[in-house]
Amino acid sequence: PLLRRLNEAMRRRRRPPHPVDAHAGLTVSIDDGTFLDLDAAWHNPLDRRDLLPALSAAGVRTAVLFHDLFPIDHPEWSDRGTRELFPPWADAHLRFDALIVGNSDWTLQRALDRRRGMGLPDPGVSGVVHLSGDGGAGRDEPVAPQGPTPTGARPGLPPQLQTAGASERRLDGYVICVSTLEPRKNHQVLLDAFDLWSQRTPGLGLVFVGRIGWNTEALVRRIERHPLLGSQLFWFAHADDETMRTLLGGATVAAMPSHAEGFGLPVLEALALGVPVVTTNGGALGEVGGDVPLRLAADDSEAWADALVRHLADEDYLRT
């Protein structure tokens, strides 16, 4: 973990400085159109509390797409930079924008509720733009914390996860969880469930696919030091499209135990490949997949273990 943090610090130092100072004297005449902020724009050095009213005064309609408001509602789930930068960015958009869009009904309603709490009426236009999934997640070169790096349904993939060919080490099935490692994603409950099922059902593995996020030092240590890592427990820090599709399509069950989501794209990615899903009702997850996924409490590791093991023995359990 210390070496990883040092490497990340060196990468940040090597990044070129943002050209905001060089551009400070430049001006652009804009008197029409729409300015739309997307994704993690709160890291942009142009303060939206100044930019948005200036654009509005020039006749430009301003708009935003919210993916969630978790840094405001649950700051403990975010890193320090996001906790500091997101609230003023979000509140500026809520105060000045003529168009507010959410990636789910839940996210949109949360944004409108906060705007109303400012004493403001609803914007002139608001709506929802849902995400979509095709089973490929657009991720990079696969990396594992231990052992050789897998590269898909080829010899580099651990034999326990091979879906074709003969292998004495191949598991009977595996549960896959695709998400960044961060507190909100609740990997902890899956590890707790895994520790419950792994001894009595050694044929069922657990696969994590996701990069290291923030506030996860204890979780990463637990994964890296787990005695079953590399035999029944696997972690891919990244996966390219082919590897992702292979791992997800070959899974017995896809699990998403998040405390809350602004949408929940991995649920759609799994369902698109015909993989049963177990998830929660946190945030917008109740909107995703309708009544198809099995939904469990986010903190009940025994219920997760029982449901996942039961599906290994009864393939129709999560399909009915």
Regions found by a protein language model. Name each.
Residues 1-320:
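Carbohydrate transferase catalytic cores enriched for Leloir-type hexosyltransferases
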